[in-house]
């Protein structure tokens, strides 16, 4: 069972499904293949180890700031043609029309692949790895 502390929601070292609330605006997935989603509002989220899925809000206002996105992780979105990835400073921004859906901290927009048919965004394979 996920542990709850103050404004933080913490997962376990197994696979968890975590949803933020108006009182839980920092979400830590920890280990396991976690699914993290957020309602309206602004949230900071960490998937932790393993392959995590970050579900963006379709409709409504607010976004998640993904603090540790890495190869193997996935961002789900509406699949809408108006969704795009922009580089703003050191972060990649997932934007639908004029509404921000997610900010991916420390990631270059050019390193992300957007698949409209599958409605997912993933990290590009590193050709140097």
Outline where the language-model segments fall.
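Glycine- and aspartate-rich repeat motifs characteristic of hemolysin/RTX-like Ca2+-binding segments
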Residues: 1-63, 83, 93-94, 110-129
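Acidic glycine-/aspartate-rich tracts in secreted/extracellular proteins
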Residues: 59-61, 70-83, 100, 107-110
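Short beta-strand
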Residues: 86
């Amino acid at each position: 069972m996920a542990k709850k502390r103050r404004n933080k929601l913490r997962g376990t070292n197994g696979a968890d499904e975590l949803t933020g609330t108006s009182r839980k605006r920092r979400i830590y997935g920890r280990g396991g293949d976690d699914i993290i989603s957020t309602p309206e509002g602004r949230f900071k989220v960490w998937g932790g180890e393993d392959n995590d899925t970050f579900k963006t809000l379709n409709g409504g206002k607010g976004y998640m700031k993904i603090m540790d996105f890495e190869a193997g992780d996935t961002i789900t979105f509406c699949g809408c043609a108006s969704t795009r990835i922009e580089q703003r400073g050191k972060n990649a921004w997932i934007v639908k029309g004029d509404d921000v859906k997610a900010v991916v901290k420390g990631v270059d927009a050019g390193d992300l692949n957007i698949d409209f048919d599958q409605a997912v965004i993933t990290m590009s394979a590193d050709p140097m790895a």
